[in-house]
Amino acid sequence: MGCSWLSCHRREATEVDGEIAAIDNVKIYKYREIRQATDDFSAENKIGEGGFGSVYKGCLKDGKLAAIKVLSAESRQGVKEFLTEINVISEIQHENLVKLYGCCVEGNHRILVYNFLENNSLDKTLLAGGYTRSGIQFDWSSRANICVGVAKGLAFLHEEVRPHIIHRDIKASNILLDKYLSPKISDFGLARLMPPNMTHVSTRVAGTIGYLAPEYAVRGQLTRKADIYSFGVLLMEIVSGRSNKNTRLPTEYQYLLERAWELYERNELVDLVDSGLNGVFDAEEACRYLKIGLLCTQDSPKLRPSMSTVVRLLTGEKDIDYKKISRPGLISDFMDLKVRGPVATKTEQVNRQNYTNPSSSSNGSSRDHSNAYSSGASSANAGNTFSSTI
């Protein structure tokens, strides 16, 4: 027999309260504290909105600035992600992960309190036009540090935490930046724990097209190599300064991975580097980063390096075996997602001069990314994302 919305909601609230109570190292905030911190959730303090609620900037009683994510009461799917995020992030700390201050589970309120990060996310800054739109200067040194920082954060999740953690939604909008442009991986609502002695987990596919590894998107088989694929896409976005998909570009330039492979085969990868750097970058290092991106996005998961190896490759501690670089795996090889265009003949630099990054270009997700702290569950419900078992 089914239950009424009210009785189901009460049972759900009780279950959430029970799970939160079982977590020892999570600070529980009173709802009135949250109201005071946000000036009663004033419009001036609202910094974003996603499919599962809103995010506010707040000042806690101890003077700390916080990003306060309020889960919508109408969202039932979001409760699962709410609990997942608390369970995952409350147990771990790393300089390249967001820090959870605590939560509020008073009555029907479900609120997460994070450290506030001043410079938003990569998709709202670098991929939205860089300095021109965000006021942030992403020189080559800053980009390299961001790439290495994200890689270190993922290596920590994949290899140092027990059980290992697969993030499942690595993308530009989930990489937040502090005032020093140090990257923090955020949004653990879709994260999965990898039990010991298991090679993969079969699960409902969730994430964002453009970052999804083909074997995961098509078969639902999740391993750490799916995160590594997503990182490879992100790495190429950071170096090129463009999203993995940009429909405002000519057809032959729209898909970043295909473009990178074409240029790699012609030994012209340097043409993919962001022209916004005005030639002020280490060409050898930039091309090495792009080749690492190709390594991470190879069709066979077994050929993708581990994240600790990626860190060593990025920092130059390990040389790239160029013989191991093969064509990247593309979902479009398995599913009819797009119409292919002709092979490009012009260089990327000419293309970059004629077609700059528009603010409306797509990075694989159709939702408003003004909410850099929005729940990963939103990704699963965006118009161009997967959210079904395949």
Curated annotation (Swiss-Prot):
Binding-site residues, ATP: I47, G48, E49, G50, G51, F52, G53, S54, V55, K69
InterPro entries xref list: CR_Ser/Thr_kinase (IPR052059), Kinase-like_dom_sf (IPR011009), Prot_kinase_dom (IPR000719), Protein_kinase_ATP_BS (IPR017441), Ser-Thr/Tyr_kinase_cat_dom (IPR001245), Ser/Thr_kinase_AS (IPR008271)
Superkingdom of source: Eukaryota
Phosphothreonine PTM sites in chain numbering: T203, T208
Residues the record lists as Phosphoserine modifications: S173, S202
Modified residue annotations for Phosphotyrosine: Y114, Y216
Active-site residues, record numbering mapped to chain: D169 (proton acceptor)
Location in the cell: Cell membrane
The UniProt record lists the keyword Disulfide bond: no
EC number, as in UniProt: 2.7.11.1
UniProt induction comment: Accumulates upon P.brassicae oviposition and in response to bacterial elicitors (e.g. flg22 and elf26).
Ranges for region Disordered: 345-390
Phenotype on disruption: Enhanced freezing tolerance due to impaired phosphorylation and subsequent translocation of 14-3-3 proteins in cold conditions. Altered cold induction of cold-responsive C-repeat-binding factor (CBF) target genes.
Domain Protein kinase residues, every copy: 41-320
GO cellular component, one term: nucleus
Membrane topology classification: Peripheral membrane protein
Listed Low complexity bias regions: 354-390
Keyword entries, A-Z: ATP-binding, Cell membrane, Kinase, Membrane, Nucleotide-binding, Phosphoprotein, Serine/threonine-protein kinase, Stress response, Transferase
Maturation and modification: Autophosphorylated.
Quaternary structure (record): Interacts with and phosphorylates 14-3-3 proteins. Binds to GRF6 at the plasma membrane.
Protein family per UniProt: Belongs to the protein kinase superfamily. Ser/Thr protein kinase family.
Protein task: Negative regulator of freezing tolerance that phosphorylates 14-3-3 proteins (e.g. GRF6) thus triggering their translocation from the cytosol to the nucleus in response to cold stress.
Protein's name in the database: Cold-responsive protein kinase 1
Gene behind this protein: CRPK1
